[in-house]
């Protein structure tokens, strides 16, 4: 009986080796992936102080680090907006020199460069005793009455002076003002009995501080000057006229005394400067004979009341008067600065040619 053929002997039913190769390939792939993963993760291992470690991946940074970065960026932004203010050196004694009235229209840098090393302060004329304004004022009343004589370059000159290392004093004649007084006789000026503007021995005119328009004009000018950067404003001629035919002055319409009118103007000025955030000194100039006498009827000054609104009082005096004026000023409890023709040996002073 013949046997049934079943194919090649030993090979027809064996499949074990092919399955083993697939398993080995999968195992090798897993090992390779694990090795690559370990090498990748090794870059992000953070070891703690106790020897343990943790993984810190870029996409999972702690919140506090992101916050720190934001804060750092914010600080950088603040630094970009930072404004640096350079403070002037503190001045103990004011050793000032009055610059020429033409300094704002000339070479102010040369004027400062010509000062001696002892000088640490300068005084600049902004408005004179005729009412003329030495800078390009924007006050409408000053423009309308023709008082503005300073050109556009005067602002740059002022900025150069106030931006220097010198302590700066702006000098302003207040009530001795021919321009505005003539333009506004009835509303602002000291007038004659006839109603026409009064004039003194030099044929110049004065503003009447009991009149609202006069106070408003002076306040506008002083406030404008305060915004130019001066460390101090020195008010001059802040009184009624002292010379001339006083009997011809019209007084019957006054609603307050001369002293009260001066104090009202001083109060208006102080209030306006406070509102304008002016942080400098406000000072006033007084003649030596009034200081020594304590008061004067014609001017309307009573020293004990007059000085209350001011930080310093400047007094023009000779070397012979200096000792007695210094002694008299002690009674008023306000800082005193003599105005001299030459520098003093010590203390504060203003040299005026």
Language-model features: locations:
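Active-site-adjacent "subsite" loops/lids of carbohydrate-active enzymes
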Residues: 85-100, 175-223
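N-terminal Lys/Arg-rich, disordered targeting/topogenic segments
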Residues: 1-22
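Aromatic- and acidic-residue-enriched segments that line the glycan-binding/catalytic groove
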Residues: 136-145, 177-198, 241, 245-253
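Glycine-rich, aromatic-flanked loop segments that form ligand/cofactor-binding clefts
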Residues: 121, 150-198
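N-terminal, intrinsically disordered, polar/charged segments of Gram-positive cell-envelope systems
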Residues: 44-94
